[in-house]
Design a protein with these regions (language model features):
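Gram-negative bacterial Sec-dependent N-terminal signal peptides
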Residues: 4-23
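A compositional/structural signature for long, glycine/proline-rich flexible linkers
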Residues: 24-354
């Protein structure tokens, strides 16, 4: 009798596993990614799950080994990720690198910004490559990478489109990316929990809060990797760049009806710096959402003043009124200077009420 019971238990277990595997059949379309029968998301799995979601979204629009070009700077009604910006035009692609692949970027005028950043299936961030050229693509895991190409925002839309159309991908394989479906409620819960940890991170680590969140296991950034930051930043800033490529400053909240200003010395980054205004949840709410060293007017002494709801005559003024009643800031240093990266020079401490 015991023998029969054991065999029955084994059969039941096998049957259960079979049912679970049937529910977890990999999908290639974003519309199939969330399923009530999908795998439950954990904080440990979230970076990979969010990367799968982003990858499937792009693949569902343009397929594999093809670009999805944003012909305009990020509009307020199309922000798939928190803390997007209008610092650059974006192009995205899902590339099958299983049998080798390259991306080719065109010649652009000297002094203009263009970069490509590969993101692996587990949201490990490879270093950027800059300017024109052909760049090899590879990954330490899986078969696909997600590419983020950034192009200088000072180009007109017509100029940007012309350069975007000269970008090309060459790949020896064109298999679609596949991902295991996930259970939506657990995804939303974990994402909310991780985003809520960002203020704690900033309070605890100060100017080093985001260091270690965007790294790769295949280069020198591996030594900076921090598992907690890796999970938190996948929710709070998916697709962010390595420390050597971009340094981010994320603020707390400010009242949206109080004038604030920051006057500071130019950090002299190799590319540029920028301020972007968001609502409390981290989304842009105005078409006038940012100012950068490429667009800001400097003071007579060479410093810069950036203003927030201080009146039209205030230097480099940005609106802050939004439904949440509060605003937040993200300051970005593209190709940060040694003063920023090594000496800890930051602009956020200069933001003060007036």
């Amino acid at each position: 009798m015991a023998s029969i019971y054991r065999r029955s238990s084994v059969l039941i277990a096998l049957f259960t596993v079979t049912i679970c595997h049937a529910h977890a059949a990999p999908v290639t379309a974003s519309s199939d990614f969330f399923s009530p029968e999908g795998r439950v998301v954990t904080q440990a799995s979230y970076p990979t799950d969010e990367t799968s979601r982003q990858t499937l979204q792009t693949q569902s629009v343009v397929g594999v080994n093809r670009f999805q070009h944003n012909r305009k700077l990020t509009p307020t009604d199309d922000q798939p990720v928190v803390r997007m910006n209008r610092d650059t035009y974006y192009s995205r692609a899902v590339v099958d690198v299983s049998e080798g692949a390259t991306i080719t970027l065109p010649d652009i005028p000297e002094g203009k910004y263009m970069s490509v950043q590969p993101v692996t299936e587990d949201h490990r961030i490879q270093p950027m490559s800059y300017g024109p050229g052909t760049f090899e693509l590879a990954t330490h895991t899986g078969s696909h990478v997600y590419l983020i190409v950034r192009l200088d925002a000072t180009f007109s839309e017509e100029e940007a489109a012309r350069y975007q159309d000269q970008m090309s991908i060459t790949a020896a394989s064109d298999k679609m990316f596949k991902a295991e479906p996930i259970e939506p409620e657990s995804f939303e819960q974990i994402e909310t929990e991780l985003k809520a940890k960002t203020p704690m991170l900033v309070k605890r680590d100060g100017i080093l809060a985001l260091r270690g969140g965007f790294t790769a296991p295949t280069d020198e950034s591996r030594g900076l990797h921090d598992e907690d930051k890796y999970q938190i930043m996948a929710a709070g800033g998916w697709g962010g760049a390595q420390w050597k490529d971009n340094i981010y400053e994320i603020s707390g909240t400010y009242p949206s009806d109080v004038c604030h200003q920051a006057t500071f010395e130019d950090p002299a980054n190799s590319a540029f710096w920028s301020f972007t205004v968001y609502n409390k949840a981290g989304f842009m709410f105005s078409d006038v959402a940012n100012v950068s060293s490429d667009t800001a007017t400097s003071n007579a002494d060479g410093t810069y003043t950036v203003s927030f709801v201080c009146g039209q005559d205030a230097p480099n003024n940005l609106p802050t009124a939004n439904e949440s009643g509060e605003f937040t800031l993200a300051i970005r240093h593209y190709q940060p200077s040694d003063r920023v990266r090594e000496e800890g020079y930051r602009l956020l401490p200069f933001v003060k009420p007036r």
